[in-house]
């Protein structure tokens, strides 16, 4: 019978990352209409004052979103702690129930056995 050992696949070595000079050369050589440069560029017909107001509004929106996120995160942590406590309580109740069932079984079995023998 042949060995069923799995052959290990040897991957080629990872190429070295580009140097800063290579990155700069690549960026300088890219055309201005390259999607990398145009994807984030927004046309703003309002002019410079509109940009300032938009930036301020965006900062405010991000601030409020951050506050909502932090509040929600705190609520989730509290809910997680409450669930953990409830889980522990249920586990303890289950263990007590198992003990009670076991005690009832031990009490009921001897009397049943004696009645069936007599």
Swiss-Prot record:
Origin: domain of life: Eukaryota
PTM-bearing positions, type Phosphotyrosine: 63
Annotated coiled-coil segments of the chain: 69-105
Alphabetical UniProt keywords: Coiled coil, Phosphoprotein
InterPro entries documented for this protein: UPF0449
Transmembrane segments: none
Family: Belongs to the UPF0449 family.
Name of the molecule in the record: UPF0449 protein C19orf25 homolog
Natural source organism: Bos taurus
């Amino acid at each position: 019978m042949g060995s069923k050992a799995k052959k290990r696949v040897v991957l080629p070595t990872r190429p070295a990352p580009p140097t800063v000079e290579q990155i700069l050369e690549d960026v300088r050589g890219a055309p201005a209409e390259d999607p990398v440069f145009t994807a984030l560029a927004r046309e703003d017909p309002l002019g410079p004052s509109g940009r300032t107001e938009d930036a301020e509004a965006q900062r405010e929106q991000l601030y409020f979103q951050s506050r909502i996120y932090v509040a929600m995160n705190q609520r989730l942590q509290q809910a997680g702690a409450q669930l953990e406590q409830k889980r522990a309580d249920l586990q303890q109740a289950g263990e007590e129930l198992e003990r009670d069932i076991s005690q009832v079984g031990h009490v009921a079995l001897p009397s049943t056995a004696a009645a069936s023998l007599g």
